[in-house]
Amino acid sequence: MAKYIMAFDQGTTSSRAIIFDHSGKIVASQNQEFKQIYPKAGWVEHDPMEIWGTQIGVAKGVIEKAGINPEDIAAIGITNQRETTVVWDKNTGKPIYNAIVWQCRRTAPICDELKNKGFDKKIREKTGLVVDAYFSGTKIKWILDNVEGAREKAEKGELLFGNIDTWLIWNLTRGKVHVTDYSNASRTMLFNIHELKWDKEILEELNVPEQMLPEVKPSSYVYGYTDKSIFGVEIPIAGDAGDQQAALFGQACFKPGMAKNTYGTGCFMLMNTGEKAVPSNTGLLTTIAWGIDGKVEYALEGSIFIAGAAIQWLRDELRIIDNSPQSEEYALKVEDTNGVYVVPAFVGLGAPYWDMYARGTIVGLTRGAKREHIIRATLESIAYQTRDVLEAMQEDSGIKLQALKIDGGASANNFLMQFQSDILGVPVDRPQVIETTALGASYLAGLAVGFWNSKEEIEKNWNVDKHFEPAMDNEKREKLYKGWKKAVERAMKWAEE
């Protein structure tokens, strides 16, 4: 009996492979960063061949590192940076353009056009998403409109579209399988989340041929097998979910009202709403959490575009820290931010503001403002943005959050997590395994092949590593938060022509 599950965690800045055992513990992990391409201001791309190369490289590397054989792997689960768009030639297998990354703002004018026509209401109702350059639909349109010969090839059925999950599965099966799961499909802005199919009216409006699109399957399902030439054996590819939905699953947030926040490049908060798609009146997204056991479950999501990336900015651009963990050390050297607020709206603001033209802002500077204050204010901005999202979620769902489960790289920052608990006024729980994105993909894959039998079995694997209790009084909490709201106002609409 195969003893392990392998997860591919293909992220925005690195490709990672992790091997898990039956108790959900990490046996071995390997990751490799790849190149970020910035052709123009606000444009972000990746090379899909480099993504495939790094992903397969770490997969082979981690098998060796774990000292196991490929036949010891019961299944592969895939989780991915969502919305990032690849269009490739189905005969040559070569991309016709770089992958357009979720952070890329180049399609903002297309989005403005849709809004001016009033088509955004229709998109909101059908897909649960707001019209934004973030999602795949307008990115596909851009490629078809701007790459020479692309539209003709697409009409002839020679081109395929996929998000990163689809691109990896297509390559793993050597072109045999062109598939995605419900969670990833729900991020394209082309998928009707109520009827569970590609929406013809939206496809027509964006002029995207349906034949380019992958088949949509449950998130826990045997999609196909890896080609023998890759690992020497055929391994079932049995789990697929977008990174945030996978993290919700990995955190065992199986009941309505359970929520998690992932602190990665961006911050993503999801609340399970069960079999009901809850529409949002506060600018959150209604999205598919996963499809499993013959049914689909939904979630409310608030996306914060810049979280960990703000700490990278302190390190790489401002050069006021040498590494990310140092941010905690410096933040603790001062009592507070001395009235400084940083609004890291480098690529606009996500939920609940959705302002594509907001830009990064530092306010409240005085002669006494030091490096430590700016570092601390940058960390605090992550917690404030999370509170913005949580308030919107509670309003939409009518559910008051009891505790927040956390994961992702920056959740290891104890200063930030304590401040998060303080500013929310609810307990925050960090699990022992913070690689919950990869863990969720593993669980989905393992359930499909009988490696695990039920969600209940998985739930028993979840254990708390550190519990944070709010230690701030309400008056101080509200005063600080009011200052944040004022700072956000200053950042909004900055780049409008």
Curated annotation (Swiss-Prot):
Record carries keyword Transferase: yes
EC numbers: 2.7.1.30
Binding site for ADP: 12, 16, 265, 308, 409, 413
GO cellular component, one term: cytosol
Annotated control of activity: Activated by phosphorylation and inhibited by fructose 1,6-bisphosphate (FBP).
Top-level taxon in the UniProt lineage: Bacteria
Positions contributing to glycerol binding: 82-83, 134, 243-244
Annotated pathway: Polyol metabolism; glycerol degradation via glycerol kinase pathway; sn-glycerol 3-phosphate from glycerol: step 1/1
InterPro entries: ATPase_NBD, Carb_kinase_FGGY, Carb_kinase_FGGY_CS, FGGY_C, FGGY_N, Glycerol_kin
One Pfam family it belongs to: FGGY_N
Disulfide bonds: none
Positions annotated to bind ATP: 12-14, 265, 308, 312, 409
Keyword Transmembrane attached: no
Gene Ontology annotations of biological process type: glycerol catabolic process; glycerol metabolic process; glycerol-3-phosphate metabolic process
Family assignment from sequence similarity: Belongs to the FGGY kinase family.
Protein name (Swiss-Prot/TrEMBL): Glycerol kinase
